[in-house]
Amino acid sequence: MSPSHAKLATVLLFDVATASADVGGTPSRLTKVARIADLLRRAAPNAALVAIVVSWLSGELRQRQIGVGWAALRSRPPAAAHPTLTVVAVDAAFAEIGAVAGKGAQARRAALLNALFAAATETEQTFLLRLLGGELRQGALAGIMADAVARAAGIPAAAVQRAAMLGGDLPAVAAAALSGEASALDAFTLRVGRPVAPMLAQTAAGVAQAIERHGGQAIFEAKLDGARVQIHRAGDQVTVYTRSLDDVTARLPEVVTATLALPVEALIADGEAIALRPDNSPQRFQVTASRFGRSLDVAAAVAAQPLSVFIFDILHCDGIDLLDAPTTDRLAALDALVPPAQRVDRLLTADPDAAGRFLEATLAAGHEGVMAKAPGAPYQAGRRGAGWLKVKPVHTLDLVVLAVEWGSGRRRGKLSNIHLGARDPATGEFVMVGKTFKGMTDAMLDWQTARFTELAVGGTDGYVVRVRPEQVVEVAVDGVQKSSRYPGGLALRFARVLRYRDDKGPAEADTIDAVRALY
């Protein structure tokens, strides 16, 4: 056995499972960071082991998907008496399960899963169940994990955060940080062909507030209701990524063609792909989203509903990194490169009335609102930075469904009233802020009944069905009010469902602070 494999064998699944339980059992951020850092020191300097531990404690598999649904986890064999499973052995088992394909794949996958659970203790089984079921919520969010990596490596947290921002892969950054090489994180730079986490926006109550928060002047842009895309070009090679950093190049040939027409050799751009009607008004979001399906006949889809691409930011252009440049400089580079037909409408103003007219015109054109950007702000990749504020005609929030109630009357037999949670950035948990059954079409009721049956935890026999907190839903609200009914002390006013956001994960849901900001 090589020294590296011997190192891998020294950390057991039990060690990770108990650390996960410890982290989930404390509300203290400092205690969470210290506990994770302690485990990471034990795993260092083995890069593979560090990456596995960081992935698991972040609630993810290195393999991402291995074909194991919740139904396969409902029954499990008796637990082992003593812990013997190593982290590397379990990771290898996940890889083996994920590689199963062809005739009899389901039975073979089930047998491998059963063997894995049979070798696990009760503590380990509980951890595996939550990890594979997507329910591992012990509060180890990216910020906490980055702090833990920094503490374990003895380096500034800002260095880890920036490397993760540029590398788009915290496990890889953690492995480098704990390798013992002082300059290991220097390799994580902005690089064409490697996606970075997109910048996200906070919410403003109106254009006047947005101008005030940006210091008296703001750049307003039309907010398109399409699909976020990050475009990379290196010579004749174009790659297109979604907001979750999935490669969708093959599904969006129009974006590739439009990018190749630009007079540039090296480019990283942020933009929106959107389906338009013949009069250039936007189609419903679902029409755009249908172009991102995995089992898509691309040629037929392009013929039936072509997409247009609009670029609203540039991060790199022909050897020049613009990530840290102010918004005005990035937009100047954009205007010099991208033709007007592929830019979003824009207005720089300090006048709330002018901004209000711009918002009204944008809404009249069929778009969902405006973005207000600070002229001097950098591009804060991977962060919901204060440099971008979204303004919509009604307040909207992206929340997570925590539970759902069976309907009555015309909705009997349908899962109807959804319980809504906002993310607590301090703990990683979700705080319930209200319920709603409004805004749901018959088709939506059918869809969510199937979806939440799949996500159900503990069966669907009761009136209230608890679900794994994975489904993000966009709701419109008239505001919030104080309430002792919910743990956050606030309740949504007149919440109604706008759409389900399959393009967003629960970590991208709005925070309880965003809800409080509407009070």
From Swiss-Prot:
Q: What is this protein called?
A: Probable DNA ligase
Biological process (GO), any one:
DNA biosynthetic process
Cystine pairs annotated here are none
Enzyme Commission code: 6.5.1.1
Q: Which PANTHER family match?
A: DNA LIGASE 1/3 FAMILY MEMBER, DNA LIGASE-RELATED
Q: Which UniProt keywords apply?
A: ATP-binding, Cell cycle, Cell division, DNA damage, DNA recombination, DNA repair, DNA replication, Ligase, Magnesium, Metal-binding, Nucleotide-binding
Family annotation (NCBIfam families): dnl1, PRK03180.1
Q: Which Pfam families match?
A: DNA_ligase_A_C, DNA_ligase_A_M, DNA_ligase_A_N
Q: Where are the active-site residues found? A: 223 (n6-amp-lysine intermediate)
Named cofactor requirement(s)? Mg(2+)
The reaction(s) catalysed by this protein are: ATP + (deoxyribonucleotide)n-3'-hydroxyl + 5'-phospho-(deoxyribonucleotide)m = (deoxyribonucleotide)n+m + AMP + diphosphate
MF GO annotations: ATP binding; DNA binding; DNA ligase (ATP) activity; metal ion binding
In this chain, ATP is annotated as bound at: 221, 228, 243, 272, 312, 384, 390
This molecule's function is given as: DNA ligase that seals nicks in double-stranded DNA during DNA replication, DNA recombination and DNA repair.
**Which family is this sequence assigned to?**
Belongs to the ATP-dependent DNA ligase family.
Write down the species: Mycolicibacterium paratuberculosis (strain ATCC BAA-968 / K-10) (Mycobacterium paratuberculosis)
List the InterPro entries hit by this protein, alphabetically: ATP-dep_DNA_ligase, DNA_ligae_ATP-dep_bac/arc, DNA_ligase_ATP-dep, DNA_ligase_ATP-dep_C, DNA_ligase_ATP-dep_cent, DNA_ligase_ATP-dep_CS, DNA_ligase_ATP-dep_N, DNA_ligase_N_sf
